[in-house]
Amino acid sequence: MADREYTLSQKQAINSSGHNILVSASAGSGKTSVLVERVIQKIINGEDVDRLLVVTFTEAAASEMKERIRAAIVKKINEVSDIELQNHFSMQLNKLNNANISTLHAFCMSIIRNYYYIIDLDPTFRIMDPTESELLKESVWADLREELYERDEDGKFALLTRNFSSDRSDEGLQDLILELFEFSNANPDPQAWLQQIAKNYEVPSDNVMDMEFIQQLLTEVKTKLMRIYRKDLDLTEQAINGGEPLKNAAEKFQNEVDDLKTIIDSLNGSWDDVQQAVSKMKFAQLPRGKKEEVQEFNAYAKSIRNDFKDEFNTIADKYFKLSSEQMIAVFKDAHDLMMKLIEVQNQFAERFLQEKLTRRSLDFSDLEHFALQIVLDDSEEGQAIRRDFQQKFNEVIVDEYQDINPLQETILTSVASPDPGNMFMVGDVKQSIYAFRMADPSLFISKNNQFKDEEQADERIILAENFRSMRNVDDFTNLIFNQVMDTEVGEIEYDDDAQLQFGAKYYPDEVQNNTEVMIYDDSQTDINDKEATPIISNKNDGQLQMIAQRIQKLFADHTQIYDKKEQKMRDLEYSDIALLHSTGSNNLEIVDTFKKYGIPIQVNNAQDYFQTTEVSIMMALLKIIDNPYQDIPLAAVLRSPMVGLKENELAFLRIGKKNGHYFEALLYFLNEAKLDSNNEFQMQLKTKITHFLEQLDHFSKLARQSTLVDLLWAIYDETGYLDYVGGMPDGPQRQNNLHALYDRAKGYEESSFKGLFQFVRFVEKMRDKNKDLAENPVVTDVKAVKLMTIHGSKGLEFPIVFLIDAEHGFNTMDEKGRYVLDRDAGMGITLKDFIHRLEIDTVQKNWIISIKKQKALAEKLRVLYVALTRAEQKLIITGAVNSADDTLNKWAEAVDTDETLIPAEARSKVSNFLDWIGMAIMRVPSVVEKYADYNTRKLQGTLIPDVELKIINSSELMDQQGLTALKSAQIPELQQLNAFDDIADVDKFKQIMNFKYHDEAATTTTAYQSVSEIKRVFDDPDKFELNFSEVDADQHIKPQNRFVTESLMAPRFMNEATKPKAAEIGTATHLILQQLDLNQPINETIIKDKIGELVMNRVLDEQVANRIRISTILDFFDSDLGQLMINHPENVHREEAFSLLLPAKGLFPKVKGDDDVLIHGIIDAYFEMEDRVILLDYKTDFVLPGSVEQGIEKVINRYQGQVNLYAQALGSILKRPVNEKYLYLLSIGRLVEIQ
């Protein structure tokens, strides 16, 4: 280590001492090396390693640091000849094992183990597994909740529950209690923090202006109003200077400015003064007229005025709707609710702690709180312990300081020397990305601002040189953050101290890699033939194929990278590439796409753990072992390799017994069905079912008699499933996933919780929370592209990094709940008025949402910084947009300024990484020249890197697909010819290429068809029988890959950030019709409540929900059929799935064999009356208002065959004919009968 050449700033960080030191270490700046060298230098200078406290973020980091220190000490022993020094180093080597180089939790554990008697704690405690802790919390809360209901004499607990829960469940309050517990526990004094959040609702002297939070709010409002005022004043002055054509507008704008000034002045008066002034504010219209001066002014002023009008209206709506009297009434009710909440929260915390102590168990949070209690104990003995720590540790070294919370900070400062300080804190606030773990970057920011003052004793050291990345990565990162990060949007200035400095001078000068921004443009995808299976199904698919093709091109171009270990250039390998994204929600799609392109890929994070085939099948089997009367898990197991039933076999079993649970159909097939012993199909099916039921019975008995882990291992062993998945693609990973499930079951049983049912329930809860049960990483030397989240990549580096899905929207769910929590601002709630059936968002809630938005945006900027700085040599950013032209126009408008920093309004409205990056690169000279039509101004500066902005559309990808398919054709005969003959045998080539399969039509037809696909093959739907009219099988759509997954992905209309499409609104309307309760009157209020419930439960996107035409739904229920549905709900069946087995050659005449096709569909609704059966299907097709009758005729022609097929299926299920068939056209609210 001594051989390494350190920079001046690194030497300063290694050698400076005698006071508190904060080291701000940018990405790639050699932070760990500096930390280790600092410890080594202290040892060299005679200090004992056990007199240092070194706190790391992870156990792996602590182990690595110990090993590096050990290696350095051993090296010193071998280097020095002085016997005294050798003895000193040898002693340090012995002391290293017991040195306090560990995680904070491990340090807290050592405090408690040594001084447990100070707080009267049983020393025989164990540390709970996080899984056990989660389960115990829920168990404790369930018991406490029942008690609170029973002794709720004043009804306050019921009111609290109703306020934070839905009509159907009281889990809303449970979620709040558990989240509030986590928030409060991240503070040194949870009780004090809880009392403070209630204080925000206290009104001193019945004057809201005396409330501390109101004064903070008004300060923030004044800043925003002053910004609006200045913009309006600027436009007013321009209108005045515009002469006679703008005279009237100038006068109106001047009145606006005066009114704004009045509002700003009123902020020093009473609340009612402000509220009345705000309510009177009216904005004038832009001037009208065709004169050039008017047109030019309007073109300039329109977007500016719209922006500040929107901002003003937001302020007015969120803060100034209520008078002071109304506000006080709301605050009083809210305060009463908060006090009850805090009372319940304290009871839960106490009960949870007592339960843990009874079990002699602690969790990680307890370790921190108990350690703090010991070091802050006011008894004489407690004070002596604190002094001992302060005297023992000559220095307290904290790694990743940006990620600690106030509780952890208090522990560390309590054991450090108070004066002079001896804390050495290292981190990079630009990489603080763990708010969900209660990390508080403000602690770092505060010291960063304080320590840079040279007049005070403490010191700040900047490590800015990046020794990881090539210059192009540094320059691009600086390019982006110079334009988007400051204290207003980002919480810190991206100044000279924050910028990356190029330090990796070992890269060869000839290696040049420009950063690429690749955008898939979905606006041209509609050119695909609507009646054919699209090569690119949607914009996400387009982006993934674009990424795969770019990777293929890297290899086709024989790309080379610089190998730092070998210190030479070499060919690119797949393992040199990493794909980073915000979430793992589309991991499965990415893996599927890469497999199609033959690109090996390894998933390093586990967002989709529960959706992996092997885990979902195992969970399905465990469910039916516990209770076989569950149709979906049972079907999954029967279809899986464990049983291996085919679709036609599944259908045959159901046909035998159409009603009841599917398990009953299995029993009926074995015990009651009349089987033909000469029928090979039936006999083979009987063998499979018999074996399966025997095995299921065996496993059920084992579940009752043995442990969960024994059951799991027996399943793995006796079914051979563990070995089977090892032979699948990514076999080692799949086996590790099953081992992880086994380990989790073992951990579960080692806790106090037992039983298969509880374990299945626990796993489902973890799945719903996207929590725990992560895949075990497979450490292999497989050369594969790495796929991981940005959070998972922190601390890692890769030669080539793709930041993908950059258009993925930020999560804003905090704003939509019934409460919002913030460490600093407290808690904001929605108050329910049950008398008037109103929900009131308190001013506190709206204020805290605003604060959290700012914090969330700052963290998203930091996440982006982490992503960009993982790249060593090349950075490629990808995204997908609905229209590239619209997107580029939006970016160009946002950066219409000569300032380097993009206006805060534009930066704060961003909802994804791509918009920040896009706005920043629109002024890069190379982009300005290439996309000159957008008239953006060039960014001025000397260190502006070239950026390649590429817009890719579907036609370009399709062209490339053809080339890719040709290059990767895997025809063995052709490969042999190509390998051994310089000139291929043309005749043999033709023979191979012209080969015709005897039943070629069957190769283009799947054994499973949905009705929506099969409807395309009807020529004469009115004459539907088992034999269809003649259809050319060649015209049938080629099947896409089919798979079954219990996907938790939201529907498409939950994911689009753009204006909802008509089809999405229709689909949402369809959903409302499906879910409305027919046992209550259907009116506008009921429908709105249902829509609100679906939005709250994240089933519907709010943007789509707002576009649902409630009148369309009411019109349906006003119709005769709608009234029939309301009057006879017991006769109505909705969303009924069916399967129908039909001969394939009847559907596709060119199919020559006797194969069958399983038709599957879902009937929207049917009425089973005494005298008739009525079939109803909702359709979302758009019908032009100007040609309604023609449009209806087209819809009838389009769906007549499908509806007739539904009718045949329904008739066969009910054993009676369908008498009436209807379509309800949602776009026009018309009921149409099908003859």
Curated annotation (Swiss-Prot):
One Gene Ontology MF term: 3'-5' DNA helicase activity
EC number(s) from the headed UniProt entry: 3.1.-.-, 5.6.2.4
Function: The heterodimer acts as both an ATP-dependent DNA helicase and an ATP-dependent, dual-direction single-stranded exonuclease. Recognizes the chi site generating a DNA molecule suitable for the initiation of homologous recombination. The AddA nuclease domain is required for chi fragment generation; this subunit has the helicase and 3' -> 5' nuclease activities.
Domain named UvrD-like helicase ATP-binding: residues: 4-470
GO aspect biological process, one term: double-strand break repair via homologous recombination
Protein family according to the UniProt entry: Belongs to the helicase family. AddA subfamily.
PANTHER family reported in the protein's UniProt record: ATP-DEPENDENT HELICASE_NUCLEASE SUBUNIT A, UVRD / RECB / PCRA DNA HELICASE FAMILY MEMBER
Name this protein carries in UniProt: ATP-dependent helicase/nuclease subunit A
Binding residues annotated for ATP, in chain numbering: A25, S26, A27, G28, S29, G30, K31, T32
Coiled coil spans: none
Subunit architecture: Heterodimer of AddA and AddB/RexB.
Cofactors (names): Mg(2+)
UniProt keyword annotation of DNA damage present: yes
InterPro entries: AddA, DNA_helicase_UvrD-like_C, DNA_helicase_UvrD/REP, P-loop_NTPase, PDDEXK-like_dom_sf, PDDEXK_AddAB-type, Restrct_endonuc-II-like, UvrD-like_ATP-bd
HAMAP family: AddA (MF_01451)
Catalytic activity: Couples ATP hydrolysis with the unwinding of duplex DNA by translocating in the 3'-5' direction; ATP + H2O = ADP + phosphate + H(+)
Limits of the UvrD-like helicase C-terminal domain: 501-795
GO cellular component: cytosol; DNA helicase complex
Keyword entries, A-Z: ATP-binding, DNA damage, DNA repair, DNA-binding, Exonuclease, Helicase, Hydrolase, Isomerase, Nuclease, Nucleotide-binding
A Pfam family annotated for this UniProt entry: UvrD-helicase
